[in-house]
């Protein structure tokens, strides 16, 4: 496998830390050892997160092409757009963000706090759009790029989750290589890796990266899209493409993609009671914050898998914490009593 042939622009501190979730493990019976790899604190750029790791492999292309404006898209409380705004500010580039109405959640301050507030503070041109949720290429995003061109600028397109970019999966191939180095220091290997999936490139990169040592099927994706067929198909497609890019040496098959689907509902961006319990439990036991859109759902999935005995006793499970806590501000009413 050859990741080093791709240019990488450093935006993170270095390897994100792996920390034990001792109190949560004990609370769940102590038969499974839980750890977290903290992508939520991987960078000094506006709280970082998984998209910052991905952007390290996209930004060299933007700079080589002489682009002056990063153009991206997401929901109103998109972590992606906040991280793109931060990177643009860091590089001295302009930033246009399309924020679509992906979540059927009504709150007076939903479009004024959290991620979108930070993007505005960082100088991004934030454009609200009424279109609903979808993980594909969006007309509103294409229009934003055309607007930049018409103004004489040179846009660099960054799709939702970085996922439709040809290099969108590379960052999390690097994640797997990083974990292998950290495992040498820890003195053990993780039996399972749990990760949230929506647009697909995070899990796709992990599938390829861990396929290098035979652990692709040990990457357990927790769907948060509530459109699992689309998400799984996109993970598989991106993983196959990424495997070719890094010269994995074998084909990625449908069996390599494991996606657990019950935890995404009632729909994208809306938490259920299990999501909220997981957020409170992880917060109160570990001081680790997760959000109602993504990490609260993947944390819920991991907790339920432990409770149901789906991990063999003695398993060491690595939770990939992808970030997202800034969105908690937009859901403050749900936590008004804690």
Curated annotation (Swiss-Prot):
Matching entries from Gene3D superfamilies are given as: 3.40.50.1100
Q: Which cofactor does it need?
A: pyridoxal 5'-phosphate
Per the record, residues carrying N6-(pyridoxal phosphate)lysine are 51
Top-rank EC class of the record's enzyme: hydrolase
At the top level, the lineage of the source is Bacteria
* Catalytic residues (UniProt): 78 (nucleophile)
Q: Name one Pfam family in it.
A: PALP
Keyword field: Hydrolase, Pyridoxal phosphate
Q: Which GO terms describe its biological process?
A: 1-aminocyclopropane-1-carboxylate metabolic process; amine catabolic process
- Subunit note: Homotrimer.
**Role according to the record:** Catalyzes a cyclopropane ring-opening reaction, the irreversible conversion of 1-aminocyclopropane-1-carboxylate (ACC) to ammonia and alpha-ketobutyrate. Allows growth on ACC as a nitrogen source.
Family assignment from sequence similarity: Belongs to the ACC deaminase/D-cysteine desulfhydrase family.
This one is known as 1-aminocyclopropane-1-carboxylate deaminase
Organism this protein belongs to: Pseudomonas fluorescens
Q: Lineage in the entry?
A: Bacteria, Pseudomonadati, Pseudomonadota, Gammaproteobacteria, Pseudomonadales
Gene name, Swiss-Prot/TrEMBL = acdS
């Amino acid at each position: 496998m050859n990741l080093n042939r791709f240019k990488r622009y450093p935006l993170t501190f270095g390897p994100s830390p792996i920390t034990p979730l001792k109190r949560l493990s004990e609370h769940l019976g102590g038969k499974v050892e839980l750890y977290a790899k903290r992508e939520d604190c991987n960078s000094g750029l506006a709280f970082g997160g998984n998209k910052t790791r991905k952007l390290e492999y996209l930004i060299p292309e933007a700079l080589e092409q002489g682009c002056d404006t990063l153009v991206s898209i997401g929901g109103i409380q998109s972590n992606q757009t906040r991280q793109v705004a931060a990177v643009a500010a860091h590089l001295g580039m302009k930033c246009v963000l399309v924020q679509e109405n992906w979540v059927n959640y009504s709150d007076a301050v939903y479009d004024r706090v959290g991620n979108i507030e930070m993007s505005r503070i960082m100088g991004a041109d934030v454009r609200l759009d009424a279109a609903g949720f979808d993980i594909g290429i969006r007309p509103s995003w294409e229009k934003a790029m055309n607007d930049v061109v018409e103004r004489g600028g040179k846009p660099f397109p960054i799709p939702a989750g970085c996922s439709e970019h040809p290099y969108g999966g590379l960052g999390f191939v690097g994640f797997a290589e990083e974990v292998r180095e950290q495992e040498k220091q820890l003195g053990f290997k993780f039996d399972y890796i749990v990760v949230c999936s929506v647009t697909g490139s995070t899990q796709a990169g992990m599938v390829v990266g861990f396929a290098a040592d035979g652990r692709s099927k040990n990457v357990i994706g927790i769907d948060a899209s509530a459109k699992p067929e689309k998400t799984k198909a996109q993970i598989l497609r991106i993983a196959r493409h990424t495997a070719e890019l890094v010269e994995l040496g074998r084909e990625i098959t449908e069996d390599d993609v494991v996606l657990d689907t019950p935890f995404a509902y009632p729909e994208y961006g809306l938490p259920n009671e299990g999501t909220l319990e997981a957020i409170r439990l992880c917060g109160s036991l570990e001081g680790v914050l997760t959000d109602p859109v993504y990490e609260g759902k993947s944390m819920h999935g991991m907790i339920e898998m432990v409770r149901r005995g789906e991990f063999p006793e003695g398993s060491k499970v690595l939770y990939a914490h992808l970030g997202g806590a800034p969105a908690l501000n937009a859901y403050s009413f749900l936590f008004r009593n804690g």
